[in-house]
Amino acid sequence: MEKEVAILGVGMHPWGKWGRNFVEYGVKAARDALADAGIEWKDVQYVAGGDTIRNGYPGYVAGATFAQALGWSGARVASCYGACAAGSQAVSVARAHILAGNCDVALVVGADTTPKGFFAPVGGERKNDPDWQRFHLIGATNTVYFALLARRRMDLYGATLEDFAAVKVKNAKHGLDNPNARYRKQSTVEDVL
């Protein structure tokens, strides 16, 4: 028998550099999602937290961190790390637990705080790690790395600068309707280029 899974509510903290702990952002989003769904925290049976590596141990165990901040309730917890995909991994883990019959109500929470400037790899010397190599050997920050990938896509598949600009235009359009979006200004392909 197939069991349906649905997202009943959503919440979001406004994007930006607000100078507070990532837990505050996650708790606000979680409470907003619960209110949007009409579900009380005590009814949540499972919490999947999207991990962040830039916030010390609480970031590594984000599921437990968010559950504790919301008020321990006995809900099971999981922490999921997948860099920029940690949130989607947390959704996948929560879905799997619902489908397995481990819970009926799950809460997925993801939040992060980042330093200003470029993201340097996590400390330590790891000469077999491509992320470490690109940063330390050739100075390729994330911006450079993604620019190189974009150029490769242009060479392999014929993508154009206008194609990439169209993505920014589309994203800006969506931001206009979202009061929590970081960028809320309409743009055109010409503006971007």
Regions found by a protein language model. Name each.
Residues 67-93:
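Aromatic/His-enriched, Gly/Pro-containing loop or helix-boundary segments
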Residues 90-98, 104-106:
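Thiamine diphosphate
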